[in-house]
Amino acid sequence: MIKKRSILIVTRKSPLALWQAEFVKQQIENSHPHLACQILGCTTQGDRLTTEKLVDSGGKDLFVKDLQKALLNRDADIAVHSIKDMSACDGPELMVGAFIRREDPRDVLIVKGELSTLPPHAVIGTSSPRRQCQLKKFQPGCKIKEIRGNVGTRLAKLDAGHYEAIVLAAAGLKRLGLENRIHYYFDPHEFIPAIGQGAIGVECRSDDHEMQTLLKSLDHRETRLCVTAERAVNEKLGGDCFTPIAAHAIIKNDQLSLFAMLGKIDGRVIIRATEIGNSEEAKRIGFKVASQLLEQGGDSLLRELKQ
């Protein structure tokens, strides 16, 4: 019996992260029967910070850096990430070898009772400056309250009465079989999702050409192009997880439409921009949308946000 070559996949230990890693594992093994994948769970620095605000501790990169360290130390062959947790640019030693076909990118509202009875001054849980900014436009009288933890933890806090509603990503709920908890889907053109929301990225070392070739069979072209356009917006703006930036791209008939926003956390200022172009020019479209945001006052807004 021929022994199968083992591929080591590193991921976070949350139920959603493990689901994503298992999905990638199955995709690899189905496409390459001579390979066997092993999942290595890692508790990242972001997972260990259960009470502090991410914005005070280094941002979403804290969910990614320990996984990247495992790649660089050659303790793993690939790392599976939620793209929205990753910085706009990869370092020279690492690259995203595959963008898995995107799940539903929308944000959703989960309510403790019924949506129809949600009061105007409801306490809504979110830790995202982007969501806070847009919630203040959607529900001006609402009170935003910080919430941390994985999907299950956040739902438990809602059920325990700490919040009257919370905002989560549709993709995570659907992947975990919790779609029945969703009360309302936000329109992604009005309440713009996070950059890369709903997309899974499989990262490998830049010098591992064998792994890059293997991952090509998993790569979804449309997802890659959409995420490339979205990430280009943030790359040009130089935003981080403290900045209320959002971008969402869709492709139809090889035409890529990109919607983006930049605003203040309190929702009093929201700048929007849209651009349509050939999908193969995804990065150029992203840069153009970012330039439009800057020209509309985004430059001074970013300086103000970084003070």
Curated annotation (Swiss-Prot):
The name of this protein is: Porphobilinogen deaminase
> What SUPFAM superfamilies does the annotation carry?
Periplasmic binding protein-like II, Porphobilinogen deaminase (hydroxymethylbilane synthase), C-terminal domain
**Annotated family:** Belongs to the HMBS family.
Q: What's in the GO CC field?
A: cytoplasm
Record keyword Transferase present: yes
Cofactor binding notes? Binds 1 dipyrromethane group covalently.
Q: In which pathway does it act?
A: Porphyrin-containing compound metabolism; protoporphyrin-IX biosynthesis; coproporphyrinogen-III from 5-aminolevulinate: step 2/4
Cofactor(s) needed, names only, are: dipyrromethane
The miscellaneous annotation reads: The porphobilinogen subunits are added to the dipyrromethane group.
Q: Which UniProt keywords apply?
A: Porphyrin biosynthesis, Transferase
The broad enzyme category this protein falls into is transferase
Q: What is its EC number?
A: 2.5.1.61
Share what the entry says about its subunit structure, partners included. Monomer.
This chain's function reads: Tetrapolymerization of the monopyrrole PBG into the hydroxymethylbilane pre-uroporphyrinogen in several discrete steps.
Q: Which GO terms describe its biological process?
A: heme biosynthetic process; protoporphyrinogen IX biosynthetic process
Q: Name one GO molecular function term.
A: hydroxymethylbilane synthase activity
S-(dipyrrolylmethanemethyl)cysteine: residues carrying this PTM: C241
